[in-house]
């Protein structure tokens, strides 16, 4: 097993990419601690993991709040004793509006859940990782960090900031046995967020949702979106010893949508 007895804390793990990572990591031997806003979703994922013979714990949280970040991390350590792998995946796209119409409070909310939460949880995880001379932090960024789209300023800024944070922590942590990397997924078309975003963008562009999706997918070399499991498999690689020499990298898993 690639992650045997490596405790993983995965944010945003009630659905989509987070759920896929949690189930795959557990199958590879990791006790996983789940967190997201909706306790019902977390409980369902935990039951699926335990039914397959894995170990799981969970706590619902609003990671725009520093106190909730601290509470979730403490709960993971209380249940499993430590955090070996931190995956910062929680996300919220925010309003699909131009900059001049973007509400400041919504901008702050998106920045906080993507960027500040990742900073706070990394700050909490690093001392223990340093003491063990071992650990992995994986940040789930986005294609939006590299290829800007209109009407998503907070999301693009937060995801780009997450890449900067990845590189800084990687530079600080590498000599202490801790690896930090990021994944930039392309459109995961099966997720609720992708579908809702696509419908909203279609209205902005004055086209049907089907036309919007077709046009977007045509810009990708593979001509399709990605699945949550494809992102999870890349995450498994980056969180395992198979990627032991990879530090401070941002890996595109996007079907050929971007080349940098």
Question: Where would I find each of the regions flagged by the language model?
Answer:
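Alpha-helical segment proximal to the catalytic Tyr-Lys
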Residues: 127, 171-172, 244
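Substrate-binding pocket helix/loop in short-chain dehydrogenase/reductase
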Residues: 69, 97-99, 103-111, 216
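Short, small/polar-rich loop/turn modules that mediate ligand/substrate recognition or access, typified
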Residues: 174, 179, 246-248
């Amino acid at each position: 097993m690639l992650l045997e007895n490596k405790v993983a804390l995965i944010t945003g793990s009630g659905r989509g990419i987070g759920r896929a990572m949690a189930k795959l990591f557990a199958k590879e031997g990791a006790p996983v601690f789940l967190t997201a806003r909706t306790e019902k979703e977390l409980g369902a994922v935990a039951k699926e993991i335990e039914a397959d013979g894995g170990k799981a714990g969970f706590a619902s949280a609003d990671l725009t709040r520093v106190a909730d970040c601290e509470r979730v991390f403490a709960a993971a350590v209380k249940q499993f004793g430590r955090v070996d792998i931190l995956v910062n995946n929680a996300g919220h796209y925010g309003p699909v509006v131009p900059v001049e119409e973007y509400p400041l409070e919504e901008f702050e909310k998106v920045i906080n859940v993507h960027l500040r939460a990742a900073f706070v949880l990394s700050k909490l995880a690093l001392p223990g990782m340093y003491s063990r001379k071992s650990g992995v932090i994986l940040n789930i960024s986005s294609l939006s960090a590299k290829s800007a789209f209109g009407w998503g300023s907070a999301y693009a800024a937060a995801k780009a900031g997450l890449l900067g944070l990845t590189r800084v922590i990687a530079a600080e942590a590498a000599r202490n046995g801790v690896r930090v990397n990021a994944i930039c997924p392309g459109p995961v078309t099966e997720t609720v967020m992708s579908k809702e975003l696509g419908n909203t963008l279609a209205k902005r562009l004055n086209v049907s949702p089907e036309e919007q999706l077709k046009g977007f997918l045509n810009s990708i070399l593979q001509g399709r979106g990605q699945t949550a499991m494809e992102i999870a498999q890349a995450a498994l690689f980056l969180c395992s010893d198979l990627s032991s020499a990879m530090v401070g990298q941002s890996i595109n898993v996007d079907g050929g949508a971007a080349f940098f």
